[in-house]
Amino acid sequence: MTAETETGIPGVPGTQAADQFNELPAHVWPRNAVRQEDGVVTVAGVPLPDLAEEYGTPLFVVDEDDFRARCRDMASAFGGPDRVHYASKAFLSKTVARWVDEEGLSLDIASENELGIALAADFPGERITAHGNNKDASFLRACVRNNLGHVVLDSAQELELLDYIAAGEGKVQPVLIRVKPGIEAHTHEFIATSHEDQKFGFSLASGAAFDAARAAVNAENLELVGLHCHVGSQVFDAQGFSLAAERVLELYSRIHDELGVTLAELDLGGGYGIAYTAAEEPLNVVEVAHDLLTAVGKTAAELGIEAPTVLVEPGRAIAGPSTVTVYEVGTIKDVDVDDETTRRYISVDGGMSDNIRPALYGAEYDARVVSRFTEGETTNTRVVGSHCESGDILINEATYPSDIHTGDLLALAATGAYCYAMSSRYNAFARPAVVSVRAGAAKLMLRRETLDDILSLEV
């Protein structure tokens, strides 16, 4: 039998592949994740099996120092914490809002309840930006009353409504206009947000963006301070960011020439790709920031306008790599796929209710046993959840050690973004707990839901 047929990994014998399975790729796992001599994985000095025993599984474990370090990395790359707005849609709690505040970053939110969470954490309204394509009067009124630093306008209807609400409150609301520069991001269709045929923003090509800018400039209770664009999420082609900036700056020039207004800010959103598996490489944010800021300065000079301050909105790139989800292995079965192929199905005690991304986007993850070393030969494996849904798959195709057994703790890395945030109660599953770890100590951020929580909504 060749090494390739043993493992599915060309040139890698089974035992060597098992050794690789014991490794924790540094570009995927939290910075403070370590496999100890007994095979147990710790994060920030806290053994994951101890956390699983205390808080149950599934369990989200957040490396606080990793999260904070990524905030500082972004601030350093883009010229200061005031230039960086953490995209709270990735994952938000009062604790996270406090971390972001303490690191000096701003915050972007996309619903009235996200705003409520931020305010409950005493996050300053002046450092909050409100997003959304369908903000209602209640949401907009809350933005104005809490003195939000920016409201990102997404439609002519919203522009008129916000002007009316601000007038009623006796205030002038700073706004950005979301622009579609027509860039096709190299990402999944559902997370590409800058092409023409989608729900967000005003078209640059059709002239709708300029019309919106003119309306905002003429509105008595709005202050147009800049433009916003976002090419997509989990983007690895860095050229798209610079190209989008160049196209949007042409609108800055037109606004300056025809409306006599110099816009001070350019918000280029986020979308910086991270590694979910060992085979992937995260986008180098330092290089992207350098290229982006250089492109903005160069293009502004060519257009004869003052270069605006560049703002960015990373979410996944901060929250994603800081977190792992710990599951307990349950049922294991071998399924004959055809006459020559057998696939091992490993079921865990969570699934699409705590991580919908594989089902929704075809997202790929990698897993590791974190309660011990694995030593077995490898086998074709699929990791699935416990839900009554054939698409409840966490890892579709993998080659994992054959000695994984019921009761093992299996962890998926890079689950800090869009996992808990998009969680559900499908099959009446209770949402998992979220625990932060730092310097050998754990702190409960969000408790595990109970049946009583689910029943509390009944009337």
Curated annotation (Swiss-Prot):
Keywords: Amino-acid biosynthesis, Decarboxylase, Lyase, Lysine biosynthesis, Pyridoxal phosphate. It comes from the Bacteria. Its cofactor is pyridoxal 5'-phosphate. The active site is at residue 388. Its EC number is 4.1.1.20. GO terms for molecular function: diaminopimelate decarboxylase activity; pyridoxal phosphate binding. Pyridoxal 5'-phosphate binds at residues 271, 313-316, 418. It is an enzyme of class 4 (lyase). It catalyses: meso-2,6-diaminopimelate + H(+) = L-lysine + CO2. Substrate binds at residues 316, 357, 361, 389, 418. The modification N6-(pyridoxal phosphate)lysine is found at residue 89. GO terms for biological process: lysine biosynthetic process via diaminopimelate. Transmembrane segments: none annotated. The keyword tRNA-binding does not apply. Belongs to the Orn/Lys/Arg decarboxylase class-II family. LysA subfamily. Homodimer. This is Diaminopimelate decarboxylase. It comes from Corynebacterium efficiens (strain DSM 44549 / YS-314 / AJ 12310 / JCM 11189 / NBRC 100395).
